[in-house]
Amino acid sequence: MQNCAFTGSNPTIAINAGFSVQWLGHASFKINTSNGQQFLFDPVSDDFDWPVNWAFSLVSDISRTPNATLTQSELNETDAIMYSHIHYDHFKKDDLSHIGQNSEFLTPLGFAEHFPNNGYKITEMAWYSSKQVGEVNVHFVPANHFSSRIMVPFIHEDHDATLWGGWVLEHQGKKLFFAGDTGYSPHFKDIANKYGNMDVCLIPIASYHSEEHPKWYRKVHTTPEDALIAAADLNCKVMIPWGYGNSSWQMGDKTSHSALFRLMHMYKKMSSNIPLHVLNEGESVKL
């Protein structure tokens, strides 16, 4: 089951948070605030960087449907780009030349060495650190995941050489949370205890399925039911799921939308009261 689309209805959610959210596919989001600022989370266009895209094509028949992309003028209007971690489906080095150097780049610790050495404005951040970008306070928060980018057996590997995490955008007392890749852990409650209730939560629901290593996959990727529990821990006023879909490489899932089907099933089974807003790639919502 591929090339699907969500055709259901979303509830009317009037929370006046002042955020406009566009899902570009997989983990990529464009966020606009009520004062006209613009932010990007994990922008990745097309397929992985070389040589991983080439290697992936050799061992898998799964390809990515081209995701929604931004125009050059939209990229030029971006105040800051935030990356959650260094994995190929969240950071594409080849995209940097298209994004340009007008924006600030906020990254986890150890990330800057993966950028070209020619003028990019990069701020590396530790967990629970903050940076003011215009009128928006940006917080880097923990996630239960890992990092790696390069592995040549017996020669080089960079496992956990860079940090990983999620992000909180805070503007005029309203907060938007982007989880990054993560498994479920007490860190969600820790984030709520430090920053308060979240208005908008962007939480992954996919990449948890593995026949060979089911326990490990779930440790580092939330299932749909884990995501609902995390949203409750954060006291989210609305949750937007991501990670499934036509532009998500079907990684760790049986079909492109199996995670969304599971979310809908578990939402009813768990009697969750977290408001959901489901987007298709390219769609946006004002909250």
Stretch-by-stretch model annotation:
Residues N118-M125, N137-V138:
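Active-site regions of enzymes building and remodeling cell-envelope glycoconjugates
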Residues L40-D42, S63, E77-I86, L106-P108, ...:
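Active-site neighborhood of phospho(di)ester-bond hydrolases with catalytic His/Asp-centered motifs
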Residues A14-L70, D160-G180:
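Conserved beta-strand hairpin/beta-sheet module of binuclear metal-dependent hydrolase folds
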Residues D46-F48, I86-F91, A112-F115, S129-Q132, ...:
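Active-site environment of divalent metal-dependent phosphoester hydrolases
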Residues T7-T12, G36-M82, K93-H98, S148-V152, ...:
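Pre-active-site segment of Zn-dependent metallo-hydrolases
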Residues D46-N53, F140-G173, P186, Y195, ...:
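Active-site-proximal loop/helix segment associated with metal-binding centers of metalloenzymes
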